[in-house]
Amino acid sequence: MNYRKIWIDANGPIPKDSDGRTDEIHHKDGNRENNDLDNLMCLSIQEHYDIHLAQKDYQACHAIKLRMKYSPEEISELASKAAKSREIQIFNIPEVRAKNIASIKSKIENGTFHLLDGEIQRKSNLNRVALGIHNFQQAEHIAKVKERNIAAIKEGTHVFCGGKMQSETQSKRVNDGSHHFLSEDHKKRTSAKTLEMVKNGTHPAQKEITCDFCGHIGKGPGFYLKHNDRCKLNPNRIQLNCPYCDKKDLSPSTYKRWHGDNCKARFND
């Protein structure tokens, strides 16, 4: 029988503190298998935590602190101490590690690995965003990504410049049924003919198009308009020069976003 139920049957409902947190049932001898009533003690959650902290039982402290709703930093520190206090780091034993890796690979191959559906990551990321600790929200990360994207756009290697990544992503979403084109709401606003073209791969957005100048291959009218007209080998493409930083041969979008009135050099004079 559950030790909490044993205590409740003998003493009634477990009381709550002023914050509405249910008190804890502590095993006096530290043996969770010994559920004798004389071995069970009802304590506040703070008292329970203090006992295990004094005993340097960091694993128990970590579990209790999660229930106490402490800050992520405090919980992380305790989790680290709990891991380091274990006599045997079982996951570092070569045989165990090899077995776990083989199991994960097998699950990935047969599609049963729990991280493949994305639901766990989605909830984890939403929680981190709510707490303000997601790496996308950190100034250092934002600056690094911005710098990398600027360089990629200038070199013409940014994923948005070629369309290959978007094309593969859209095809994947269509195949697994998660594309918004296939949602019930979108179906009400989209003709059956369009949906049929998407399913059989004949939609204009799925049609492969080759740049007339450099031979680069992309998909959809958008690729032709954005790449063909702006291709560096197109002699008739619009070329703009920034009057502040002397950068030349800029596309309209790059000029509008990073140069002209928005150029950093303009404010350094």
UniProtKB/Swiss-Prot annotation:
A Gene Ontology BP annotation from the UniProt entry: intron homing
Keywords of this entry: Endonuclease, Hydrolase, Intron homing, Nuclease
Enzyme class, first EC level, given as a word: hydrolase
Gene source species: Enterobacteria phage RB3 (Bacteriophage RB3)
Listed name of the protein: Intron-associated endonuclease 3
One Gene Ontology MF term: endonuclease activity
EC number: 3.1.-.-
Keyword Hydrolase: yes
Its biological purpose: This endonuclease is specific to the nrdB gene splice junction and is involved in intron homing.
InterPro entries the UniProt entry points to: His-Me_finger_sf, HNH_nuc
Keyword Glycoprotein tagged: no
